[in-house]
From Swiss-Prot:
It comes from Shigella boydii serotype 4 (strain Sb227). The gene is recX. This is Regulatory protein RecX. Belongs to the RecX family. It is found in: Cytoplasm. GO terms for biological process: regulation of DNA repair.
């Protein structure tokens, strides 16, 4: 740690660190708190910031006030990002829960997002197993397991074959 950074107050160092973290991508409040509390890797190994709980609260409040930290924006972007990567609603909900997002906020964002999960599940299945999708039971089970692992709901998976039969 340099001499100039050691003289800076803990609040200023925390705020600088928070802005750097949030400049890369959106984070949930819980993620930011966890990252701010983690020790900083310095030249001589991990270094603690001697900050009080009040300093952490002030930094979080400042980030909220200035629009750097917004859980609803984070949730909407996270859902869009993970759905583009081919993950289903169950997996996305579970990941958001791990990131400290409330169930109510997650459900609200899932209702507001305009994603056709059945079409997305079909797209993932055809990417992995080619078109047309197999109708043999053993092959259908493989596809179902794959889609369940990716986080799709069983009703969306079954709709693939119902719509395919039409």
């Amino acid at each position: 740690m340099t001499e100039s950074t050691s003289r800076r107050p803990a609040y200023a160092r925390l705020l600088d660190r928070a802005v750097r973290i949030l400049a890369v991508r959106d984070h949930s409040e819980q993620e930011l708190r966890r990252k701010l509390a983690a020790p900083i890797m310095g030249k001589n190994g991990p270094e603690e910031i001697d900050a009080t709980a009040e300093d952490y609260e002030r930094v979080i409040a400042w980030c909220h006030e200035h629009g750097y930290l917004d859980d609803s924006r984070f949730v909407a972007r996270f859902i869009a990002s993970r759905s583009r990567k081919g993950y289903g609603p169950a997996r996305i909900r579970q990941e958001l829960n791990q990131k400290g997002i409330s169930r109510e906020a997650t459900e609200k964002a899932m209702r507001e997002c305009d994603i056709d999960w059945c079409a997305l599940a079909r797209d993932q299945a055809t990417r992995k197993y080619d078109e047309p999708l197999p109708t043999v039971f053993s092959e259908k089970v493989k596809i179902q397991r794959f889609l369940l692992y990716r986080g799709y709901l069983m009703e969306d998976i079954q709709d693939i074959w119902r719509n395919f039969a039409d």
